[in-house]
Amino acid sequence: MVRKLIAVVIVLLVAASLPAAAKMRGPSTPEERAQALQYVQSLEDHPLAKDSLEKRMWLTEWLVQIPDVTVNVCCKELKALEALDKVNDTYSNQLRMQVYYSQLAFQLQHPDEKSTATIQAAGLAGTLRAYRAIQQFDPSAKYPLLDNLMSLERQGKLQKYVQKRNKCVKG
């Protein structure tokens, strides 16, 4: 409960600072991008590590502030992640935010990629990596939506699936 409250407060603070922050700073620096990539990889591999909350806070604030990278939720399944806490709220916040962080990492690694479906699929793939890591720690963690998406990923159909459900203009 306390972690959920902290996460809500953080999101509200970051959202409130968005207009001012976007005007006050320039594009991300190479050092920041390297740190972001390191944090995202760490959160995908070890989403429950002791320092994961600090990394999520830094990534969220940074993502809101930088004008040169944005993430979107265009795929129905990405929007459905909002409802994960109705199924099991133990890890829902971590998984819900991971999709944004993994999209961010993909865009940093592939700056010329313009296909929103590809970017969205990368966000989901990163979320599924974090989900698998959580399940290794807690086998009782079950989210049917993510289980279905993992099945599609194993079949090599995740990107095609996302592309069919993409509601953004590009891709």
Language-model-detected regions and their locations in the chain:
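Positively charged n-region of N-terminal signal peptides that target proteins for export
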Residues: M1-K4
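Bacterial N-terminal signal peptides
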Residues: A7-S17
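Mature extracellular/secreted ectodomains of secretory-pathway proteins
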Residues: S52-N166
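Extended hydrophobic/Leu-rich segments
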Residues: L18-A20, Y100
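Short, solvent-exposed mixed-charge patches
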Residues: C168-G171
